[in-house]
């Protein structure tokens, strides 16, 4: 009979790992970046007594990533058209106006302007 834990049985799917030598370091998982905490903070500002499921959080995170990529791509094209090498707040604002419809664009631009003003005054 083979010693258990050392040799894989025939037809076994998992490979048997040899025991780690003393002092061996544990491998850390790569961190997954997410907008989850920020989405949660905004939710609590708007609806303090409402929660969010992990599935809904995944969908919201995907949505924020998608919008970010669209705005960044459009702003990048605008800088290329104007033969510039730096994306400024003006390009971001124009990209938002081009991507978002009507009233939503107006609100996004005003909130963005407010955030930039708050950031520059805090410096």
Curated annotation (Swiss-Prot):
Protein name from the UniProt record: Histone H2B.1, embryonic
Entries under SMART domains matching the protein: H2B
Top-level taxonomy: Eukaryota, Metazoa, Echinodermata, Eleutherozoa, Echinozoa
Alphabetized Gene3D superfamilies for the sequence: Histone, subunit A
Protein function: Core component of nucleosome. Nucleosomes wrap and compact DNA into chromatin, limiting DNA accessibility to the cellular machineries which require DNA as a template. Histones thereby play a central role in transcription regulation, DNA repair, DNA replication and chromosomal stability. DNA accessibility is regulated via a complex set of post-translational modifications of histones, also called histone code, and nucleosome remodeling.
Family, per entry: Belongs to the histone H2B family.
Post-translational modification comment from the UniProt entry: Monoubiquitination of Lys-118 gives a specific tag for epigenetic transcriptional activation and is also prerequisite for histone H3 'Lys-4' and 'Lys-79' methylation.
GO (cellular component) term, any one: nucleosome
Transmembrane intervals: none
Gene Ontology MF terms in the entry: DNA binding; protein heterodimerization activity; structural constituent of chromatin
Biased composition (Basic residues): 10-32
Description of how the protein assembles with itself and partners: The nucleosome is a histone octamer containing two molecules each of H2A, H2B, H3 and H4 assembled in one H3-H4 heterotetramer and two H2A-H2B heterodimers. The octamer wraps approximately 147 bp of DNA.
């Amino acid at each position: 009979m083979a010693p258990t834990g050392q040799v894989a049985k025939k037809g076994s799917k998992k490979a048997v790992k040899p025991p780690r030598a003393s002092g061996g370091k544990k491998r850390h998982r790569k961190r997954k970046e997410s907008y989850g905490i920020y989405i949660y903070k905004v939710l609590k500002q708007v609806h303090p007594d409402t929660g969010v499921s992990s599935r809904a959080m995944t969908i919201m995170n995907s949505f924020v990533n998608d919008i970010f990529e669209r705005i960044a791509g459009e702003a990048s094209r605008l800088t290329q058209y104007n033969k510039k090498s730096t994306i400024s707040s003006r390009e971001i604002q124009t990209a938002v106006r081009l991507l978002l419809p009507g009233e939503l664009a107006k609100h996004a631009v005003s909130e963005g302007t407010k955030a930039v003003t708050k950031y520059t005054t805090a410096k």
